[in-house]
Amino acid sequence: MAAEKQVPGGGGGGGGGGGGGGGSGGGRGAGGEENKENERPSAGSKANREFGDSLSLEILQIIKESQQQHGLRHGDFQRYRGYCSRRQRRLRKTLNFKMGNRHKFTGKKVTEDLLTDNRYLLLVLMDAERAWSYAMQLKQEANTEPRKRFHLLSRLRKAVKHAEELERLCESNRVDAKTKLEAQAYTAYLSGMLRFEHQEWKAAIEAFNKCKTIYEKLASAFTEEQAVLYNQRVEEISPNIRYCAYNIGDQSAINELMQMRLRSGGTEGLLAEKLEALITQTRAKQAATMSEVEWRGRTVPVKIDKVRIFLLGLADNEAAIAQAESEETKERLFESMLSECRDAIQAVREELKPDQKQRDYTLDGESGKVSNLQYLHSYLTYIKLSTAIRRNENMAKGLQKALQQQPEDESKRSPRPQDLIRLYDIILQNLVELLQLPGLEEDRAFQKEIGLKTLVFKAYRCFFIAQSYVLVKKWSEALVLYDRVLKYANEVNSDAGAFRNSLKDLPDVQELITQVRSEKCSLQAAAILDASDSHQPETSSQVKDNKPLVERFETFCLDPSLVTKQANLVHFPPGFQPIPCKPLFFDLALNHVAFPPLEDKLEQKTKSGLTGYIKGIFGFRS
């Protein structure tokens, strides 16, 4: 990757030729960043390069490393655009290729005659990257401000223009073959993105296919380490190609696009929102043929389009969750499904007017039979609560695995049994809400099934409460709770009968019974050892002395706390100790000293009458 020297300051008028791309933080950190990005790469270390030598530039590696280090790891395109502007300015200053000064702009173009240093190619590449990052920033903002889409397309065209300029420069004989191919692939990629935004599917797929072909050839021509970057770019392009193929008329592409949702992190870039819209559009077409749904022996009509779309995608969503490769993907799919379900429930609620609720709650004089719309609402609520239970159960499984493993980093907080107790509390609350659904009060099979599920999760909740008591050595409480777990589990085994199919997706209670029996044996042994330790005569080596170590050097004591972070070594802060103070001296002889009289030395005060008083008023008194 090309490197830059540290350039002090950050001002200057250079780098203004990219069309306003450096507006955010143009001078921020230009002098404070400690990097070597502007140094001449190893391929061109001589100052006076002979024309027979080849210039080389790792285009894909440079942009990928820059993007990951300057904002795109978190989707911050504005930060990356500012970085491109600052790097351009540093390159122009290093190469003495400034666009005039702060008072006057003088446009300069990189020509073939200047290609004595690959940093001139890097300068054009940063122009294209700056325009592209600005376009992606505008794409994020265009969701709320549609007018910014026109500016987005303008920036993409600018990026393609700079990429074409880079490709033209790389056609020079001074540039090696690999750089030429990378420049062609980069131009094809940006061109495909522009056509994609214009919805010119045929031109877009041609550009993406060209880009994919070049990167595949480059990946096959180099070592595995170098090929990883090219293969990663090919994977990024593939969803765009399938989406374009679907819009051209390839109906089989929709299945591959659906599978792409199962990848960890999902699709990104231009395709993320378009893929979701495509799936919704496909389901909307299928929803036109859906008129009713059957649940627990009752068929109800479905007239709300949003509900039809959700119910049609229900099976696909459940299959996607089952096939998810990672926990992050599974959690994302759970959240997406719950969000769609909440929207469908809200659409049904809007149809359920308060007066219609009261009027339609009973039909044909049959008490307990709710209206079709209310029953549909109960069905959607059942789906939402069941999905929430499955999600929390999946989270509980992950916490159980983490609880059984030793933490690799002691500084990180490891999971505790209390975390699992909270999850099972939420699950039990969801089961209580299921029992209260309108229209299912007289469904004995449903009530029995939910009752058995409640017992299963109560058993697991009780088990982890017992585990938390074991940690604080409350043996009797833990033993009672283990017995309660066995009671719940035995009730499930005895009453399951015909409901075993509905309970097969739940945690195995037989495995829980085996684990509880093992834990009870360990608990009883630990309780006996603890009791025997407490009854042993206390010796100097067994008594835990609260004195700090500095005060008991003469006594041998096995104190495990001395090797922990809370070792009691000294008193801190130190206690107060009495110290001698400065003595006080009292002059006792002074009380017995007789001083000579002073009456003869004091002036006798003479009495004055009214005359003296008047003189004193007017100031004549001497």
Swiss-Prot record:
UniProt entry keywords in alphabetical sequence: Acetylation, Cytoplasm, Endoplasmic reticulum, Nucleus, Phosphoprotein, Ribonucleoprotein, RNA-binding, Signal recognition particle
Spans annotated as Disordered: 1-50
Stretches for region Required for interaction with SRP72: 564-592
InterPro entries xref list: SRP68 (IPR026258), SRP68-RBD (IPR034652), SRP68_N_sf (IPR038253)
GO molecular function: 7S RNA binding; endoplasmic reticulum signal peptide binding; signal recognition particle binding
Modified residues (Phosphoserine): S45, S238
Sequence segments annotated as region (RNA-binding): 1-231
Residue ranges, compositional bias (Gly residues): 8-30
Basic and acidic residues composition-biased segments: 31-40
Modified residues (N6-acetyllysine): K448
Annotated Pfam families: SRP68 (PF16969)
Superkingdom, taxonomy of origin: Eukaryota
Intracellular or extracellular location(s): Cytoplasm; Nucleus, Nucleolus; Endoplasmic reticulum
One record GO biological process: SRP-dependent cotranslational protein targeting to membrane
Family per similarity comment: Belongs to the SRP68 family.
Function: Component of the signal recognition particle (SRP) complex, a ribonucleoprotein complex that mediates the cotranslational targeting of secretory and membrane proteins to the endoplasmic reticulum (ER). The SRP complex interacts with the signal sequence in nascent secretory and membrane proteins and directs them to the membrane of the ER. The SRP complex targets the ribosome-nascent chain complex to the SRP receptor (SR), which is anchored in the ER, where SR compaction and GTPase rearrangement drive cotranslational protein translocation into the ER.
Complex formation: Heterodimer with SRP72. SRP68/SRP72 heterodimer formation is stabilized by the presence of 7SL RNA. Component of a signal recognition particle complex that consists of a 7SL RNA molecule of 300 nucleotides and six protein subunits: SRP72, SRP68, SRP54, SRP19, SRP14 and SRP9. Within the SRP complex, interacts (via C-terminus) with SRP72.
Domain notes: The N-terminus is required for RNA-binding.
Protein name: Signal recognition particle subunit SRP68
Gene from which this protein is expressed: SRP68
